[in-house]
């Protein structure tokens, strides 16, 4: 039986789930990059679904040590011919959401988390543009963003965003490379 939690705890739980799905996105991008850049390793990897070949695992570990943004940038570059501008926009949005979650101010005393973008006004404007944020006249100065994933519509919107990449984009790219999606996802 699932117990109903107070909103602050529910927000932390749902935010944690979203964060883990962004980690899954990063891992899948990693496998797609490795497979595209290393066709011989890909063949060995696909041929042994229950055991990851040592050389392939070494490549994975190299990517596990990288930040999401570095993996995302390489992924977008390597698959530039196969990604639509909308898919790149969605992956960028996932990157921003991951950073927001990772750097949020968390409290179990309120039903939202706060995130303060860093990097100056230019980067703030890019974040606002990439996420489609509409600032009100009463917006905090400096800008603070609320994370309210306890709200079902907010959680569902992010879930749909991630699903559009994992279930459409990644499946298509894996098929193009001849990799069973279940092996990398």
Positions of predicted regions on the chain:
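Canonical alpha-helical transmembrane segments
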Residues: 73-74
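Short acidic (Asp/Glu) patches
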Residues: 77-86
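Amphipathic alpha-helical interface elements
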Residues: 1-70, 85-96, 100-113, 147-185
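C-terminal structured domain segments
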Residues: 137-146
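Short secondary-structure subsegments characteristic of cysteine-rich extracellular domains
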Residues: 115-138
């Amino acid at each position: 039986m699932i117990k109903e939690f107070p909103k602050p705890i529910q927000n932390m739980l749902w935010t944690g789930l979203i964060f883990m799905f962004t980690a899954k996105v990063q891992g899948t991008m990693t496998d797609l990059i490795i497979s595209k850049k290393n066709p011989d390793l890909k063949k060995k990897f696909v041929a042994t679904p229950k055991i990851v070949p040592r050389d392939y695992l070494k490549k994975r570990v190299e990517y596990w040590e990288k930040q999401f943004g570095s993996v995302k940038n390489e992924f977008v570059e390597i698959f530039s011919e196969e990604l639509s501008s909308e898919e790149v926009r969605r992956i960028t949005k996932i990157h921003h959401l991951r950073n927001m979650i990772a750097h949020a101010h968390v409290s179990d005393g309120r039903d939202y988390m706060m995130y303060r973008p860093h990097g100056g006004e230019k980067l703030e404007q890019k974040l606002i543009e990439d996420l489609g944020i509409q600032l009100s006249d009463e917006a905090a100065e400096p800008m603070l963003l609320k994370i309210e994933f306890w709200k079902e519509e907010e959680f569902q919107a992010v879930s749909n965003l991630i699903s559009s990449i994992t279930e459409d984009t990644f499946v298509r790219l894996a098929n193009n490379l001849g990799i069973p999606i279940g092996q990398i996802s």
